[in-house]
Structures are given as C-alpha cells and as structure tokens.
Design a protein with these regions (language model features):
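SH3-family beta-barrel domains
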Residues: 1-13, 64-75
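Basic/aromatic-rich interaction segments and small domains that mediate binding to polyanionic partners
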Residues: 6-59
C-alpha cells in the first residue's frame, strides 16, 4: 500500500543536501524485502522510516532528521 505524506520538519543539514523539502509531498510504501516502511526522497532514493507515532512518520540518524504527516486523499 502506498501513502502520500507531507514533510512538516526537515533538519537543516538534510534540506541543504536536497533530500527532503518542507511542505513537499513524498511517497511512503511497505517494502516486503526489507520488511519496513520506506519513503522516497527527491531523487527517488528509499529511506527507512525509523519511527511512526501519533500519525507522524519520522526519520532518525543520531537526531530527528525529518518528520512527515499523511496527506488527505483529496489532495
């Protein structure tokens, strides 16, 4: 199943490297081989979703790198 999410927070070093941009919409999907939810960045590279809490998808390194919320189907 594919879900579309909007970036609500992107850590400065990630934004500088153009991985994700706040306010843009990205695709989240479940990868059977990796057995994990993945998110595609600006260049189509898949990132592991590190954490899902309160309806938010998070990517972590040593700190929170990015946060996303689900986009309504009508958008």
């Amino acid at each position: 199943m594919t879900t579309f999410v909007k970036a609500t927070f992107v850590e400065e070093k990630m934004a500088d490297l153009s991985f994700f941009k706040e306010g843009k919409v990205y695709k989240v999907y479940y990868d059977e081989d990796r057995r994990n939810n993945m998110i595609e960045d600006e260049e189509g590279i898949a990132w592991f979703i590190s954490h899902l809490a309160n309806g938010e998808y998070h990517i972590y390194g040593t700190t929170l790198l990015a946060k996303f919320v689900t986009v309504e189907e009508s958008l």
